[in-house]
Amino acid sequence: MVLLLNCIVAVDQNMGIGKKGHLPWPLLINDFKYFQRMTTSSVKNKQNLVIMGKNTWFSIPEKNRPLKDRINLVLSKKLKEIPHGAHFLARSLNDALKLIEQPELVNKVDRVWIIGGSSVYKDAMNYSSHLKLFVTRIMQSFETDTFFPEIDLKNYKLLIEYPGVPSNTQEEKGIKYKFEVYEKIVNTFLFKSHAGLTCSVKPKEASYDFELS
């Protein structure tokens, strides 16, 4: 099964995403509503899975845990038991994605969202060839100690528009920001077989398209 992963994040001009486990900027209500809408919108009778590291989980105010109307999965190599309020615990992103194929989840999960922190974002960007990044671009700098990985435009394409994502610049509390969506570029390699067929192969996929040459 080829699984599409979605990372959603807000970054400042230096790709900073946090400071001491909290947002470096004041709460931006429209961005918060955007996060809620994107991560909860799902097809009927299914819910989205939100995957987060232990620190991200505990940075959420206890009264708001778990994130409602979503399946909450926490990643940790140290925790032995599922944190109170969470639904699942996995040691790694790879283990988490294997859980989705299990009977208890396979018919319940619609979309998969990675919501932090930095190392989990990095793992997702390295793991999947089918990946979208939903980036809230804060158009100023803040004091931060945690960063989002570099978005290499050799590997990612900035989409001109995307359904449900506002294209105009937002402003709240004197802070301007915009919503961006990036799609990971899947390279296709061509080679000719001895039978005279041209085969296009996409890395890490069991997908092959043949045509006569």
UniProtKB/Swiss-Prot annotation:
GO terms for molecular function: dihydrofolate reductase activity; NADP binding. GO terms for biological process: dihydrofolate metabolic process; folic acid metabolic process; one-carbon metabolic process; tetrahydrofolate biosynthetic process. It catalyses: (6S)-5,6,7,8-tetrahydrofolate + NADP(+) = 7,8-dihydrofolate + NADPH + H(+). NADP(+) binds at residues 10, 16-22, 54-56, 76-78, 116-123. Pathway: Cofactor biosynthesis; tetrahydrofolate biosynthesis; 5,6,7,8-tetrahydrofolate from 7,8-dihydrofolate: step 1/1. Residues 4-184 form the DHFR domain. Substrate binds at D31, F32, K33, Y34, F35, Q36, R70. The keyword Oxidoreductase applies. Gene3D superfamilies: Dihydrofolate Reductase, subunit A. Its EC number is 1.5.1.3. Keywords: NADP, One-carbon metabolism, Oxidoreductase. It holds the Pfam family DHFR_1. Belongs to the dihydrofolate reductase family. Key enzyme in folate metabolism. Catalyzes an essential reaction for de novo glycine and purine synthesis, and for DNA precursor synthesis. This is Viral dihydrofolate reductase. The lineage of its organism: Viruses, Duplodnaviria, Heunggongvirae, Peploviricota, Herviviricetes. The gene is DHFR.
